Every structure is written in structure tokens, then in C-alpha cells.
Amino acid sequence: MANRINASNLSDLLLPMRQRGNAPGVYFVRLCQWSPEIKDFLWRYHEAARAKGVIIEGQIGNPDERQLSYLTEMLGSAFEPNPAFITQALQKWMPRMSQANRVSFAEAMCDQMDELKRKGKTDSIIRNIYMKVMCWLYYKFERLMPFLGDDNPPRILYECNAVTAHELILLRILSLM
């Protein structure tokens, strides 16, 4: 799993992994101000995300009935919050994802589920979050799968006013891969 590291400046966000210092990792940045420098950086980052990543404008939105139905058709209705179950589900659901990335994703997802349990979330809530994250992964982030684990990681540009707790869970999982 990749570690989350802090950027010393915005241009760090475009560096390949090998140029990110002694402990390479991923960046998770929220910009809350505007300047000509930020505008220029965002244009470069936007182009990088367009070429090799995902651009999300506005919130992701809940999966619709058709998407949930397809998820259930493909994976069944069973759910177990453990890495083996999630890795097996990802084999069917995300065929372009490498086995190593399936394992990393499953471990990161289980870490997030464990954190939710510690906060008092029920199994039903955790199952619903699992279904939501799996739908988002398939319908919004599938394009990232071939690039995960590369020296030049995919970019995610998320343009919105506020990120929901569930969206943060997915972004956190992806940042740990």
C-alpha cells in the first residue's frame, strides 16, 4: 500500500513516484483558495487527469437502481467484510484490475470498514457503503485500473464544493493502493 505524503509545493503533485523522496507515496490535497499560480497548476493537473486519470465535476452521486441491480447480478447479494471476500468479488467486478491491486484495494476497504465499525456503524450501513463504493469504482473509476501501481500514478481531479463522507472513503481507499 502507498503511504500518504505531504507536498511541499503544487508541482510535487505531478511528480512520478520515483521522484517523491525517500518515502514515495501519494498526495491527497484540497485547495481552498484561488490565485494565478493555482489556476496554472490546475490546468496542468486537469490535463494530466484527462490523459491518465479521472475528472469528477460535482459530487459522484448515489448509484441508481440499474447499477445496484447489475452489481447484485454479477456478485450476488452476499457480503462479508473481509479481504478474501472483497478480493474475490473484485475478480469478477473489475477484471482489468491486477491481482495485487485487488488485494490492496480489499485491504484498504477493510481498514475503512473496521474504522466505521469502531465508530458504531452497523453491518447494514457497512454493506451499503460497500455496494456504493463498488458501483463508484466500476462506473466512475474503472479507467484508473490499468494505471494503478505505475511509477506515474493516475490523477484524480475532484471539483466540488464539498466531499461526502462516503466519497472520502473511496478516495482514501484509492490513495492507499
Protein language model regions, located:
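Short boundary motifs at domain starts and secondary-structure transition points
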Residues: 11-21, 141-150
